């Protein structure tokens, strides 16, 4: 037998033996690792996640989510597994599970849920991924196709064959994706009913996420905005939802929702990006890590990170980036700027007259042309770069760009007062009160329409709907 077919046969036979009984379904699944290896993989991935995502700094909320998760996990197919539930300090609407029982839920998703039962539904879905060993299955499938690709590449000398089989492996995993998500939902329904929660909460979460999607579709003019959608429950289609409702009819029992406990736990939850990434209120950004504050043009989208800020014009045609780096105090802003752009020719170079901090600005010859600027403060240089695919768009926005650069300053007491993050406050609706009674723009940081939409989304009342006396309501302060 020729070498390559023989080697492929050996590899395929070895892979074919890699089956294990799925603890959640009782069926044989293709898995190339035992549960001990799966645990080790989860520990390693968990360390990576901890480095990438900050933990939300609220011990009481963390303990509450852990308590709810443990209640559901006790009734899963792997009750002896030590599940660890963690709230991530992220505004995204997402949750995910790692092999071995590590489950993460983003702070942003908690803000839009309306009961403990809905939180339990999200956690039950992720527990289902763990009990069915979906992470181990995906990794095993990827390893299998990778091994076949390496053998084919070895025999043919063509690396593209390996790439093709890797792509095929990826397609296989994506094909299993919908099946795995539905299986996780089916398991979630079982776990919710067994642990005493109302299984209807699973559909309620889907409705919450669908409202988010409808809102984002209506806000297409917002450039660079990403849905940050939940991969799990919302990764569905009508057939999926119909199947869920059919399965739900089997899971009988009243079940609890525990809205009071959830709203009390949620009071004070931060809305928006982590404080360590700067706090944006309307046009005003106060950035603690960078040690500065500045004002952006109305309608611009501002993306703040721990070490940088990028803003986009309303049509997305122009961007303005800001970074900070140490600077030699003996340099002048103009000398620094010239050196920082590698000696390239600067056009219309001048000092920043009227700025709170000493600085300089110029046009950098293209293509594409860019506006560059620098300001000095506390032995640091704050470097701005503005650009656009079309030079005309940048020139049209140049006055706004320069106004933003000139607004850069150290953090004042007023800036510090505005740097407090926006938080959810939970209240009970009184007799005769309506949703509009709770919409107070306050410091004019957002429009009345935007605030109403936000409150509607937070309370699953988008696009229409009103509150009733005695209802819990999330408001923004």
Predicted regions and their residues:
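Extracellular LysM carbohydrate-binding repeats and other cell-envelope/extracellular binding modules
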Residues: 449-477
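Signature of long, low-cysteine stretches enriched in small and polar/charged residues
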Residues: 321, 337-388
């Amino acid at each position: 037998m020729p070498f390559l077919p023989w080697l492929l046969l050996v590899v395929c036979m070895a892979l074919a033996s890699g089956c294990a009984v799925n603890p959640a379904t009782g069926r044989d699944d293709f898995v190339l690792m035992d549960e001990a290896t799966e645990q080790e993989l989860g520990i390693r991935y968990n360390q990576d996640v901890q480095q990438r995502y900050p933990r939300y700094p609220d011990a009481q909320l963390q303990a509450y989510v852990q308590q709810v998760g443990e209640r559901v996990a006790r009734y899963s197919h792997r009750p002896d597994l030590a599940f660890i539930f963690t709230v991530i300090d992220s505004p995204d609407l997402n949750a995910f599970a790692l092999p071995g029982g590590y489950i993460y839920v983003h702070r942003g998703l908690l803000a839009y849920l309306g009961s403990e039962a809905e939180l339990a539904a999200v956690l039950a879905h992720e527990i289902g991924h763990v009990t069915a060993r979906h992470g181990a299955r995906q990794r095993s499938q990827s390893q299998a196709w990778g091994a076949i690709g390496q053998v084919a590449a070895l025999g043919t000398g063509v690396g593209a064959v390996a790439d093709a089989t890797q792509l095929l492996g990826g397609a296989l995993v994506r094909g299993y994706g919908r099946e795995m998500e539905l299986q996780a939902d089916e398991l979630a329904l079982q776990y919710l009913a067994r642990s005493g929660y109302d299984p209807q909460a699973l559909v309620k979460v889907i409705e919450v996420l669908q409202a988010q999607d409808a809102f984002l579709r209506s806000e297409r003019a917002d450039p660079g905005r990403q849905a940050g959608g939940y991969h799990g429950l919302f990764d569905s289609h009508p057939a999926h939802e119909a199947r869920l409702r059919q399965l739900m009819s089997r899971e009988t029992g009243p079940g609890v929702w525990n809205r009071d406990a959830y709203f009390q736990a949620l009071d004070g939850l931060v809305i928006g990006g982590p404080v360590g990434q700067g706090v944006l209120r309307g046009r005003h950004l106060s950035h603690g890590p960078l040690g500065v504050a500045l004002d952006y043009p109305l309608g611009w989208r501002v993306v703040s990170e721990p070490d940088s800020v990028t803003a986009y014009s309303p049509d997305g045609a122009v961007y303005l980036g800001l970074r900070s780096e140490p600077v030699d105090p003996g340099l002048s802003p103009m000398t620094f700027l010239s050196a920082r752009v590698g000696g390239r020719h600067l056009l219309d170079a001048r000092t920043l007259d009227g700025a709170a901090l000493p600085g300089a600005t110029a046009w950098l010859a293209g293509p594409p042309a860019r506006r560059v600027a620098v300001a000095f403060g506390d032995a640091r240089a704050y470097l701005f770069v503005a650009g656009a695919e079309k030079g005309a768009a940048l020139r049209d926005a140049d006055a706004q760009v320069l106004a933003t650069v000139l607004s850069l300053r150290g953090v004042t007491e007023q800036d510090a007062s505005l740097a407090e993050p926006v938080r959810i406050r939970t209240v009970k609706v009184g007799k005769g009160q309506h949703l509009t009674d709770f919409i107070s723009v306050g410091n004019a940081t957002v429009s009345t329409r935007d605030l109403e939409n936000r409150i509607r989304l937070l309370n699953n009342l988008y696009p229409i709907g009103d509150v009733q006396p005695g209802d819990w309501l999330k408001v923004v302060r």
